[in-house]
Amino acid sequence: MKEVIAIIRPKNMKKTRDVLESLGFPSFNATRVLGRGKQRAIIDEVTIPSPSPEIDEVRGTMRYIPKRMIQITVEDPDVQLVVEAIMKVNHTGKIGDGKIFVCPVDDAMRIRTGDRGTEAL
């Protein structure tokens, strides 16, 4: 089993959800997160007014950008399909498209039934 973690733009959440559901993956977690990559700023990504832009420039800081984090655990043969689907929906070729991480999952347990492994998915 693997956990696929994707950080995407909020505006792409519905399309991503719809594609995953259409492929047979309706179960996942989605969380509102704040973050940034290596870029210093993303023009037009957010419209949150800064209380003091001069201070931001002087300190060299950057506010974090609102994103969505999707976490979905799938069986090994399904990883490529899920990753490709997320990539297809979210790829624009522009800074801020997001990131995808694939992590190993040793075990899973369904609390209600006690099912383990892939049966718990």
From Swiss-Prot:
The keyword Transcription applies. One of its GO terms (molecular function) is enzyme regulator activity. Pfam families: P-II. InterPro entries: N-reg_PII, N-reg_PII-like_a/b, N-reg_PII/ATP_PRibTrfase_C, N-reg_PII_CS. Keywords: Nitrogen fixation, Transcription, Transcription regulation. One of its GO terms (cellular component) is cytosol. GO terms for biological process: nitrogen fixation; regulation of nitrogen utilization. Could be involved in the regulation of nitrogen fixation. Belongs to the P(II) protein family. This is Nitrogen fixation nifHD region GlnB-like protein 2. It comes from Methanothermobacter marburgensis (strain ATCC BAA-927 / DSM 2133 / JCM 14651 / NBRC 100331 / OCM 82 / Marburg) (Methanobacterium thermoautotrophicum). The lineage of its organism: Archaea, Methanobacteriati, Methanobacteriota, Methanomada group, Methanobacteria.
